[in-house]
Amino acid sequence: SAWSAGLSLSQAAFDITSRLQTIDETILNNDLPYRKLPQLQANGLFPTAHDPLEFTLGSEYVYFEHPEAGSPTLTVADNADRARSAAGVRYNFRRSWGHLVPSYSHRYRYYSIYGGPLDQQEPHLAVPVFNVDSGLLFDRLFQFRDHAFIQTLEPRLYYLYVPYRDQNHLPLFETAKNSFGFEQLFRDNRFTGGDRIGDANQVSL
């Protein structure tokens, strides 16, 4: 088990969140996940005068700490700082009958690893992500046993393109594959956490 404390500050277009997490000290060191001491996040959505064009910005800083980091008996990466960002633009076209939202973002990962070979202490990665989310909304009134109902049909088409980038040089602190389900069809990353960006060239219906 773990405990965490957080602080959030929000305005119309921007929010900042900080978290501090520690782990139950009764767990054996070999089984401990990394502590986040701390985790800082900032996210923004910035409309423009050319509505519905919008700019998006997401950023995060985490210091990962593990009591067994660097031990020769464990396959645990050293303690590290991780910074990641996602700066993007999207055309958020929405009407009562449907939506069309193409978007592009540039995603960046940077690590500063304490210990290890000098040429591997600052791995980084940059990946472009492009997607188009579109959908239609159809409503139909019908009667059943003297009661009026509305039947709704919402077909959706989603395209995602993320080029392949070799990421074996990046450490793994908190990342795993998402379990496959309906929601996964419309996500832009098949991984949880912030250490991996999955490549894709797919259409979801």
Where are the model-predicted features located?
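Outer-membrane beta-barrel proteins and related beta-barrel translocases across Gram-negative bacteria
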Residues: 1-205
